[in-house]
């Protein structure tokens, strides 16, 4: 469950705390083997072989989500705009007109040390008014998966 989630002016913002240090949460966000274990909302999986992360400014952060029921595929193509390990990752998600996302989405992921763990702040924009709630739900579900991975 998110500590908090808001959507305003077509921005989605989620704050989550984890009982793991920022370095561990960072690794789970940038290591392909770990990303494949938690990326995607419920009902979607991310095959390890689809995860390509070039951890540098201008690098790629690409993967493929596969619907476990229908087999449908949703490619995620992102460019790394900013990286400062283990504190900040900024990505630009390529448009996905088939889902109603006609503009690039910029997602900012901040990792803050907090009470012996990590406070993770994720913000993304611009979302359409229709897609913002779905993005919030999807991010919440995949951060639940991340929490389970970090607790294992």
Give the label of every model feature segment.
Residues 1-46:
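Hydrophobic ligand-binding cavity/cleft-lining segments
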Residues 90-141:
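Beta-strand/loop substructures that line and gate deep hydrophobic ligand-binding cavities in soluble
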Residues 16, 50-51, 76-82, 106-112:
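Hydrophobic/aromatic beta-strand elements that line small-molecule binding cavities or substrate pockets
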Residues 25, 29, 35, 61, ...:
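Hydrophobic pocket/interface hotspot
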Residues 9-15, 22, 48, 60, ...:
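Intrinsic-disorder/low-complexity, polar/charged segments enriched in Ser/Thr/Lys/Arg/Asp/Glu/Gln
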Residues 70-77, 101-104:
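Short coil-to-beta-strand transition motifs
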Residues 22-23, 54-56, 81-88, 110-119:
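A short, structured loop/turn motif at beta-sheet edges
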Residues 13-14, 33-73:
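Short beta-edge strand/loop motif at the mouth of beta-sheet-based domains
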């Amino acid at each position: 469950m998110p500590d908090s989630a808001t959507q305003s002016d077509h921005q989605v913002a989620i704050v989550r705390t984890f009982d793991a240090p920022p370095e561990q949460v960072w690794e789970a966000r940038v290591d392909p083997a770990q990303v494949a274990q938690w990326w995607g909302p419920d009902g979607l999986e991310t095959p390890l072989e689809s995860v390509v992360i070039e951890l540098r400014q201008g690098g790629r952060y690409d993967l493929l989500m596969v619907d476990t029921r229908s087999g449908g595929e949703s490619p995620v193509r992102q460019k790394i705009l900013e990286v400062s390990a283990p504190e900040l990752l900024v990505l630009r998600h390529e448009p996905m007109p088939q889902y109603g996302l006609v503009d690039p989405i910029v997602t900012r992921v901040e990792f803050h040390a907090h009470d012996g763990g990590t406070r993770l702040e994720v913000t993304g924009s611009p979302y359409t008014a229709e897609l913002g709630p779905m993005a919030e739900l999807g991010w919440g579900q995949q951060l639940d998966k991340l929490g389970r991975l970090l607790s294992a």
